[in-house]
Amino acid sequence: SVSMLVLGFIFLGARSYANDVAVIESEMVATAKWVAGNLPSDVLIAAHDIGALGYFDSHELIDLAGLISPDVIPVIRDEEQLASYLDQRRADYLIAFPEFYPILTEGAEIIFTTHSAITLTFDQKNMVVYRWKTP
């Protein structure tokens, strides 16, 4: 019946929403709070997901998704050009899930990782703060 189908979708939607909130809290929010309490105030941070950073922290940000940094959009899918862009902008740190930017994060110095078990249960890697070495 339609009502059973609707109830099924409500249950699945609620579970999906709860999982999303758990990941956001244990990854993005935890990282943003760590950044706010541990990085110097004058550093420039590049990040793919800036929502929690913008809410919990006041550092200057480079938005690798292009929402507040639209100049990144032409190179958004090219990690080598993104690396040049971060060097040109003189970024100090990069915050990302490692699988988002395997070239940018390869060999980069890890400053912080969340170690959230929640994310690992979804077979994903934890969010990481990397030191970005500008030449």
Label for each model-derived stretch:
Residues 107-119:
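Low-complexity, intrinsically disordered Gly/Pro/Thr-rich segments
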